[in-house]
Amino acid sequence: SKTYSITGWRLGYTIAPEEITERIKKVHDFLTVGAAAPLQEAVIPGLRFGRDYYDELLKTYTYKRDLFVQGLDAIGLEHTTPQGAYYVLMDISRYGYKSDLEFCEMLARDVGVGAVPGSSFFREDVNYLIRFHFAKKDGTLHEALNRLEKLKKL
């Protein structure tokens, strides 16, 4: 889903001997529902992309990551700097909210920036992180950073 900027889509494949493939199919049937036929068709062109596509994708995501994390740094917000993900986790513990969901609701309502509660991604009781997705247009990232400046006043 990250490689082709289709976040949320889940599709995978295996290449294996027939006897292993039969076992994989049995396990797969118990764990998932099938990927939608349009999704399966949509991924075919992506499997044919050459190395240049992936090199350019790396440059693009690295640029967007750096743009966003440098903006967060300039505002003084604590965050992770991902090495391979298309999102940044920001530490909200200094704001005193009881939950990351509560903070995300305030952020959307009062600041005009959407984020996902980090607790959605942890088995442990982690409620002091929120997740920003940076695979966006540059203008969207700049606008989000401008709006996040409001957090300085909290």
Residue ranges and their predicted role:
Residues S1-L154:
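PLP-dependent class I/II
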